[in-house]
Structures are given as C-alpha cells and as structure tokens.
C-alpha cells in the first residue's frame, strides 16, 4: 500500500500543469490607437479551454493561435477575418505552441513555425506548410525552446528554458545558436521595420525592463520599465516600431519612445472580460488581438 501511495504521489508530481482557460478577442482600431479605449471587442475564439498565442499574418487577414479544448492536446488553428471561420491546421500526437508565420514577405504561403513538444517532451523549433502539414525540424540541437521571434528568414530569437532562462540568437542555415542574454521573460518580438528584437529582462535589483537587441551588432539597449503590476509582462509593438502595448490586470497600456510613463488605452473589465495577458497587433494596425482569462462557466 505504501508503495502504491508513493507511486501515486510521483505520478501526480510528473503530470503537467493544466493550461489556463483563456479566450481570444479582436479589438478594432478604426481610428488608430486612440480609438481603442472606446472600441468593442469581438470574440475570435471562446471555446471552453485554452485559446492563446495569437499571431497575425503579414496581410492581417488571418490570425494563427494555439488551442487545447480537451485538456490533452494543443494544436494550431487559424481564424479568417474575412469569413469569421476558424480552421484547425494541425492534428498531431505532439503538442504545437507559439504558432508564428514565417517571415517570407506579404503572404503566408511559406507556412508557419511552432514550438513543438515532441513525444519524449523535447521542445524544439519546427515548421509546417500553410495547411498545417509536412512538419520539418528547423533546429536539431537547440533545445528546450520555449518561445521564438523571427528576425529574418534565417535568424530567429529564442527563449531557451533553463536556470536561468536565456535569450539566444540562432541561424537556421548553420543550425547554431548563441546566448546573448540571461534572465529573460517569455515575450519576444521583432521590432517592426528593424532587425532588432525586444525582450523583458530582470535586473539584479529585481526590476523588469523592456530592452532591445540589434541582431547584427548584438548591442543591447534599455527602453523602459514594464507596467507596474504586470503579472506576465506580455507586450507587443504597434506597426510604427515606436509604440509598445503591455497588459496589466484587465488593462492595456501604451508607451512611445521618449515617453516617461505608460498610458492606459483599454480596460477589458468595461466589457465584462477578464485579465488580459498576451497581445498581438495586426501589421496594418487596424486590429489588436487580446487574450483574456476565461469566465467561470
């Protein structure tokens, strides 16, 4: 009996933590960022379970996202903004997260990349074609990958899990990666119009700063402290490459280069929505996707 109890405790400890219940909403920006405060969010995916990690296509017409509705399997879905339809792209025994359109130009024809949790739980960077087929391993020896952001068709910034978590720049062509920072957060983004990537970095003082690294020179520059009370420190860039959005509780704040503080631009609570975590911005700047905590059902 004691052995059975110990086995049960061990198995419980090994079980993965359940994914949070989250929904995705689209917030239209008909009058630029200033119109976000009065905009009405519309549901993109609100099925029971995990709907998260939205990413717009280059033309802004589609939104990739990861979803897990049965508590077991995470796959990639796509929302078509023109038809309002959601289509499942991957159906695999593995888990696919962080779907990201490949930086191929104006269309999504080259497919998308994902962080794939393989059958042995190894997490590496893979790619699929545009219809969610033909999986291909991009970086064989770089692991365990948590999140990623493309700099260009060859170079990719990676959040590598570890003690501490590290920021690495990798080349798909060479298969090699280089550690460029330690102690980073999960929110990685290429800054529009540049070959720089932003990341959240924990200072020795305990403060969290948004910083940028130039992928060519490796120069790192601080930008601003994160929003006070931001639990997950999730952020996104507006298309101008000058303005950052960051979530904090049920609110979204903006910061523009040169500003001394953050400005509130949206409150999900006014629409009876929960706390905001991840944010994605359409390349045209006409819509923002927000991930909110799922209401109790």
Where are the regions that the model predicts?
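Sec-dependent N-terminal signal peptides
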Residues: 2-11
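Sequence signature of WD/YWTD-type beta-propeller architectures
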Residues: 13-297
